[in-house]
Design a protein with these regions (language model features):
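Cysteine-centered functional microenvironments
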Residues: 59-69, 102, 122-130, 134, ...
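Active-site-proximal alpha-helical scaffold in enzymes
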Residues: 76-88, 137-148, 154-189, 228-249, ...
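Condensing-enzyme catalytic core mediating Claisen C-C bond formation in acyl metabolism
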Residues: 3-7, 30-34, 211-293
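Acyl-CoA/ACP chain-elongation machinery
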Residues: 179-225, 258-272, 298-305, 320-370
């Protein structure tokens, strides 16, 4: 099998409009959670989220196009541009051998909501002709492939909160099997809208700490009461190791393991077994290396954090890696989370630093591992793992190693 490496990364979330500012804020333990400003949430049981701030879509999309493109696509375009520029390709790039895998859990939910209201109040003839394209998850990859001229495979993953991680696995397969030499992975989500917040709130999935937003998301803490919705995008450029080496590319990391599994249990409630099998598969594919750090799924929900902790204990026994969840800082970005957290994991490898799990305030007997509480830690990292688990029992895990 061909070796697959990361040569470009990009990221946008509630803590920054690019990868460097985002990662710095994450490592500093800052929180991007605050009161919702994208709509009036006064009458909602949940009034907080991790919104991308100071984002100007006109810097990404031409003025005439802004209303035609949903916010999740706008954020994705921004992160993809950063990753492509970071990869430093020349003009001679063979774009027929360059593909894309896009990921989103919900896609253009704000546009679906908006046009549903228009249809109900003003009739079907008033629906925008751009509504359907703007709502489709695969339009994220479609528009980015058009912008960059990428003519290889164009695939989309829609597996809830595991989508971004599954997209990385699909990119690996495309390169390893010879269907492409390079792949761009982009996960994006922007579901902070009345229907999005209202829907998750009705499931009792979200934290209701409206008066203390920055301490609301508290992964692995005993007093966690649900996740905080986030938005953003993460992008990674993958290519064959030999190709990257030949062109003198900066290699951030090698993707050495990928695992996926299904719980086959419940539409929303996770199991211990499913995540455990995904992690086992990823480790087996990687050759069972010593893992130094796990970027956990760590959603701040009572069941997930307990189950993920138990699965990690069962898998690693007495050799448990350092663990942290960065969702306390970025919020839970749903289908974009896996891509964003893969970027964070790769940057942790690059800089030799493990981001903290913020809001670790009250110890939980069922979550009793080293989650890097509140303050980042300098560590010589060689191998890192990133987990993503989604509704419908979809599980994904990736393993990266530093390339000497």
């Amino acid at each position: 099998m061909k070796r697959v490496v990361v040569t470009g990364i990009g990221m946008i979330n509630a803590l920054g409009l690019d990868k460097e500012s985002s990662f710095k804020a994450i490592c500093n333990g800052e929180s991007g959670v605050n009161k919702i400003t994208l709509f009036d949430a006064t009458d909602f049981p949940v009034q907080i989220a991790a919104e991308v701030k100071n984002f100007d879509p006109l810097e990404v999309v031409d003025g005439k196009e802004v209303k035609k493109i949903d916010r999740f696509i706008q954020l994705g375009i921004k992160a993809a541009r950063e990753a492509m520029q970071d990869a430093g390709f020349s003009e001679e790039l063979d774009k027929e051998e360059f593909g894309i895998v896009s990921a989103s859990g919900i896609g253009g939910l704000p546009n679906i909501e908006k046009n549903s209201i228009i249809c109900s109040e003003r009739g079907p003839r008033k629906i925008s002709p751009f509504f359907i394209p703007s709502a489709l998850v695969n339009m994220l990859g479609g528009l980015i492939s058009i912008e960059h001229g990428l003519k290889g495979p164009n695939i989309s993953c829609v597996t809830a909160c595991a989508a971004g991680t599954h997209a990385i696995g699909e990119a690996y397969k495309s390169i390893a099997l010879g269907n492409a030499k390079k792949m761009l992975v982009i996960g994006a989500e922007a579901a902070i809208c009345p229907v999005g917040i209202g829907g998750f709130a009705s499931m009792k999935a979200l934290s209701t700490r409206n008066e203390d937003p920055q301490h609301a998301s508290r992964p692995f803490d005993k007093e966690r009461d649900g996740f905080v919705m986030g938005e953003g995008a993460g992008a990674l450029v993958f290519e064959e190791y030999e190709e990257a080496k030949k062109r003198g590319a900066t290699i951030y990391a090698e993707l050495i393991g990928f695992g996926e599994s299904a719980d086959a249990h419940h539409i929303t409630s996770p199991t211990l077994d499913g995540p455990l099998r995904a992690m086992k598969k990823a480790l087996n594919m990687a050759g069972n290396p010593k893992v130094d750090y796990i970027n956990a799924h760590g959603t701040s929900t009572p069941v997930n954090d307990k189950n993920e902790t138990a699965a990690i204990k069962e898998l690693f026994g007495n050799n448990i890696p350092l663990i942290s969840s960065t969702k306390g800082q970025t919020g839970h970005c749903l289908g974009a989370a896996g891509a964003i957290e893969a970027v964070v994991s790769v940057m942790a490898l690059r800089d030799g630093v493990v981001p903290p799990t913020i809001n670790q305030l009250v110890k939980d007997d069922e979550c009793d591992l080293d989650y890097i509480p509140n303050i980042s830690r300098k560590v010589d990292l060689k191998v890192v793992m990133s987990n993503s688990f989604g509704f419908g029992g979809a599980n994904g895990c990736v393993v990266f190693k530093k390339v000497d």
